[in-house]
């Protein structure tokens, strides 16, 4: 069973709809027992880094998710969910993240021709292979974000060019992140979710 983690973070309905389209058994839950028994976890998210971590802490889910990852359960963070995977965020204030991947989440600097938030379709550039990256080179996916994860190159699988090289997919061990919205990225996005689910079997 894939568990989509419930912490009032926005795009859960779209993620569940995409998984249903793939015929995947999934459930929205904040139940610690279900989370640590899951075959895989998806941490979605739309909103601000500090508020998200505060809500996860309030529900007692930070320790639970860390326990699940330590057990080897695959975790996919989407959009804000990916940003929460790193050590800290600098949105509004400095806030501790999960720390699964070293690095920080910081604001994209607006430049001529590159407004913030970064919103719309961008082509992916695969930097290194992971279980989720097959067939992604040059494919377009949908982004909506103002912050990005600044992490070491060894954890960056896929990037997009947005005045700077923005990490679009990161991973370390059983922890994966997608800065874009696979659930809003058509067949390409569904393919990424399918690869993640296959990884969890």
Curated annotation (Swiss-Prot):
<keyword id="KW-0315">Glutamine amidotransferase</keyword>
<keyword id="KW-0456">Lyase</keyword>
<dbReference type="Pfam" id="PF00117">
    <property type="entry name" value="GATase"/>
</dbReference>
<dbReference type="GO" id="GO:0016829">
    <property type="term" value="F:lyase activity"/>
</dbReference>
<dbReference type="GO" id="GO:0005737">
    <property type="term" value="C:cytoplasm"/>
</dbReference>
<comment type="subunit">
    <text>Heterodimer of HisH and HisF.</text>
</comment>
<keyword id="KW-0378">Hydrolase</keyword>
<keyword id="KW-0368">Histidine biosynthesis</keyword>
<dbReference type="GO" id="GO:0000105">
    <property type="term" value="P:L-histidine biosynthetic process"/>
</dbReference>
<comment type="function">
    <text>IGPS catalyzes the conversion of PRFAR and glutamine to IGP, AICAR and glutamate. The HisH subunit catalyzes the hydrolysis of glutamine to glutamate and ammonia as part of the synthesis of IGP and AICAR. The resulting ammonia molecule is channeled to the active site of HisF.</text>
</comment>
<feature type="active site" description="Nucleophile">
    <location>
        <position position="79"/>
    </location>
</feature>
<dbReference type="GO" id="GO:0004359">
    <property type="term" value="F:glutaminase activity"/>
</dbReference>
<feature type="active site">
    <location>
        <position position="181"/>
    </location>
</feature>
<protein>
    <recommendedName>
        <fullName>Imidazole glycerol phosphate synthase subunit HisH</fullName>
        <ecNumber>4.3.2.10</ecNumber>
        <ecNumber>3.5.1.2</ecNumber>
    </recommendedName>
</protein>
<dbReference type="GO" id="GO:0000107">
    <property type="term" value="F:imidazoleglycerol-phosphate synthase activity"/>
</dbReference>
<dbReference type="InterPro" id="IPR017926">
    <property type="entry name" value="GATASE"/>
</dbReference>
<comment type="pathway">
    <text>Amino-acid biosynthesis; L-histidine biosynthesis; L-histidine from 5-phospho-alpha-D-ribose 1-diphosphate: step 5/9.</text>
</comment>
<dbReference type="InterPro" id="IPR010139">
    <property type="entry name" value="Imidazole-glycPsynth_HisH"/>
</dbReference>
<keyword id="KW-0963">Cytoplasm</keyword>
<dbReference type="InterPro" id="IPR029062">
    <property type="entry name" value="Class_I_gatase-like"/>
</dbReference>
<keyword id="KW-0028">Amino-acid biosynthesis</keyword>
<feature type="active site">
    <location>
        <position position="183"/>
    </location>
</feature>
<feature type="domain" description="Glutamine amidotransferase type-1">
    <location>
        <begin position="1"/>
        <end position="201"/>
    </location>
</feature>
